[in-house]
Structures are given as structure tokens and as C-alpha cells.
């Protein structure tokens, strides 16, 4: 009886920042930043979002600025 393989090839994640040719990640663009935050309010890692290291730093800094300005919550509401 032949063994069957589980799973398959994983699709490579696309860097959302590079794909849309965004040079500056604005902290006021909350709709864009919400793609990089979990439902608990934590910043998602590169392995989940598929961003490059450079763009991950830009996103993290923008999220932190938006939190300080009160545009994004520090933690999720229950």
C-alpha cells in the first residue's frame, strides 16, 4: 500500500508593503496597519505576514506610534 503525503507546497507570502510600492508606512493609515496586528492587538511576526525585515521594522515603528497617538489599542477589548 503506497504512503500518501500530507500537506503540499506552501505558497510564498507576498510582502504587502513592497507589492503596493509603499515607501513610507504612515502611522495614520490604520487600515493598512490592521493587517499586521492580531485580534489580540499584538504585532504579527514576519513569518506570518511575509514582510521583509526592513518593512517589518517600518510597520512595527508605525504601529507603536499609532498606539501612542491613540489610533490603535495597546491590547484588545474582551
UniProtKB/Swiss-Prot annotation:
Question: Which domain of life does the protein's organism represent?
Answer: Bacteria
Pull one GO CC term from this UniProt entry: cytosolic small ribosomal subunit
Keywords in UniProt for this one?
A: Ribonucleoprotein, Ribosomal protein, RNA-binding, rRNA-binding
- SUPFAM superfamilies linked to this entry: Ribosomal protein S18
Q: Which GO terms describe its biological process?
A: translation
Q: Which GO terms describe its molecular function?
A: small ribosomal subunit rRNA binding; structural constituent of ribosome
What is this protein's function?
A: Binds as a heterodimer with protein bS6 to the central domain of the 16S rRNA, where it helps stabilize the platform of the 30S subunit.
Similarity-based family: Belongs to the bacterial ribosomal protein bS18 family.
Whom does it interact with, and what assembly results?
Answer: Part of the 30S ribosomal subunit. Forms a tight heterodimer with protein bS6.
Q: What is this protein called?
A: Small ribosomal subunit protein bS18
The organism's lineage is:
Bacteria, Bacillati, Bacillota, Bacilli, Lactobacillales
Tell me what gene encodes this. Answer: rpsR
Amino acid at each position: 500500500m503506497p504512503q500518501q503525503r500530507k500537506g503540499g507546497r506552501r505558497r510564498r507570502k507576498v510582502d504587502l508593503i513592497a507589492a503596493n510600492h509603499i515607501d513610507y508606512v504612515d502611522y495614520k493609515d490604520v487600515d493598512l496597519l490592521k493587517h499586521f496586528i492580531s485580534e489580540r492587538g499584538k504585532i504579527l511576526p514576519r513569518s506570518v505576514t511575509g514582510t521583509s525585515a526592513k518593512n517589518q521594522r517600518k510597520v512595527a515603528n508605525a504601529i507603536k506610534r499609532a498606539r501612542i497617538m491613540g489610533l490603535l489599542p495597546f491590547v484588545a477589548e474582551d
